[in-house]
Amino acid sequence: MEGSDDDDGVPQLSSHALAALQEFYAEQQQREAQKLGPDHEKFSVGSVEEDWQLSQFWYSDETALSLAKEAIEVCGENGRIACISAPSIYQKLRGLAGESVYIRLLEYDNRFAVYGDDFVFYDYNEPLKLPESLEPSSFDIVIADPPYLSEECLQNTAQTIKHLSRGKIILCTGAVMEDLAAQKLGLKKCKFIPEHTRNLANEFRCYSNYELALDKQGLA
C-alpha cells in the first residue's frame, strides 16, 4: 500500500552487502568528480564511458585521430563536418580543429549534450528529424558509424547522410554491410582499417566515396 511504513516481506541487505554497495557508489561519484576536475581532458576519447546497451564501442586514439585529420584535410580551414553516431571522432576533431571549423555531433546519447551547441540529438529511427540549422547539402564531409549492424539502421542513417552531405562521405561499419553501403551510398571499401579500444567480434571496415588521404599515405 502506498505510504505504508510496514517493512514486512521487504528484503534487507546484509551489513557486508550494504558496505559494498556504498563503496561502489562512492567510487562512481569519485570518477564523475574527476571528469569535472581541471586535469580532465574534456575532449579525450573515453571521457564519456561506453554504454554497451547503446552499442557503443569507442575507437582507439590512433583511429579517431587519423579519421579526424582526414576530415580536417578534406574540409579545410572554414569547413563543415558532421559526425553521425561517431562521438570519439568528434572529440578528436574538436581537440584539433580551430573555431572556424563548424562541427556537429549527431548522437542519441544525451550525455554528449555537455558539448553544447555542437550536440544534436539524433535517432536513426527518424532520420530526417533534424533542426533547421542542419540544412540539406551543407556539410563538406559526413562521417558516420551506425550503432547497429542491421539493414534498417544503415538504410535510415544513409538517408541522413545523403540529406546533409554535399560531397565526401566516410562510413565505418561492419564488413557484412559492404554491399548495402555500395547500394545505398555508392561507397567503396578503403584500405584503412579502423580499430577500437576493445576487440569486436565482427570485422570492421571503412567505406568512402573518394580516395582517402590515409590510403594514399599508406597508413592503412
Swiss-Prot record:
The keyword Methyltransferase applies. Its main location: cytoplasm. GO terms for cellular component: cytoplasm. It catalyses: L-lysyl-[protein] + 3 S-adenosyl-L-methionine = N(6),N(6),N(6)-trimethyl-L-lysyl-[protein] + 3 S-adenosyl-L-homocysteine + 3 H(+). It is found in: Cytoplasm. It is an enzyme of class 2 (transferase). It comes from the Eukaryota. Its EC number is 2.1.1.-. One of its GO terms (biological process) is peptidyl-lysine methylation. Pfam families: N6-adenineMlase. Keywords: Cytoplasm, Methyltransferase, Transferase. The keyword Lyase does not apply. InterPro entries: DNA_methylase_N6_adenine_CS (IPR002052), Efm5/EEF1AKMT1 (IPR019369), Mlase_EEF1AKMT1/ZCCHC4 (IPR041370), SAM-dependent_MTases_sf (IPR029063). GO terms for molecular function: methyltransferase activity; nucleic acid binding; protein-lysine N-methyltransferase activity. HAMAP family: Methyltr_EFM5 (MF_03187). Protein-lysine methyltransferase that selectively catalyzes the trimethylation of EEF1A at 'Lys-79'. Belongs to the class I-like SAM-binding methyltransferase superfamily. EFM5 family. This is EEF1A lysine methyltransferase 1.
